[in-house]
Amino acid sequence: DAFMVLSRIIASFHNEKGELMIEGLTSTDMQVTELEESFLKKMLGSDEINLFDTESISKRLWLEPALDVLAIDAPPVKEAVNLVIPKASAKISLRLPPTEDPEHAMKMLEDHVMKNIPWNAFVKFIPNSKGSGVVADPNKPFTKELVNSFNSIWENDTAYIGVGGSIPFANDFVREFPNAELVLVGAADEELGNAHAPNESVQIDHIEMLIESLVQTLKNIS
């Protein structure tokens, strides 16, 4: 049954603690703000989420590879009948820390899939799009000036988080303009941000403060 084969392969990606079981993948070593468990559960909308006694939530969230199943093609529930399923497929997303080579990661993912095929079933691995990430240096002049503006306008210390580094165009920018600084900033609703979702939300006052910070920084360096 193709669905059972697919289920076994998907189950092989993680162990009982939710740790990724694909051999050969690497993590990124850098300093980021440590998220508190209570904040993360509030952000995810549930106090019942099992975080598996993770040593560092921030490292696992931002600096290690993560895999999820985006979609599965198989008979829908409404059309299901009591027959053996002849074929099934899934689209897998493997999010990488910015220092991981996507070519290497794709090969490791394929090797894992092919090593975990049950019952001598026929399985085809089809690579899709991939992109390289980048690590932005927070100690460069423009970045430090921008952080000073953030601190002043928000009246709070800036926290560094590990997001955006796997966006492929960021690496393209660094490659094309090696002497330029890369700073990834954005505005979001702290309670209802829902990035990438249909109901993604931003706080208007945060957008205004972000613009003010950028303007102040440009004035300071001009």
What are these regions (language model features)?
Residues 20-79, 83-87, 102-108, 116, ...:
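An extended, acidic, His-containing surface patch that forms the Zn2+-binding/catalytic region
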Residues 1-18:
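A short core secondary-structure module
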Residues 92:
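Active-site helix-to-loop segments that bind/position phosphate- or nucleotide-bearing substrates
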Residues 7, 11, 110-114, 147:
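Generic solvent-exposed, charged/amphipathic alpha-helical segments
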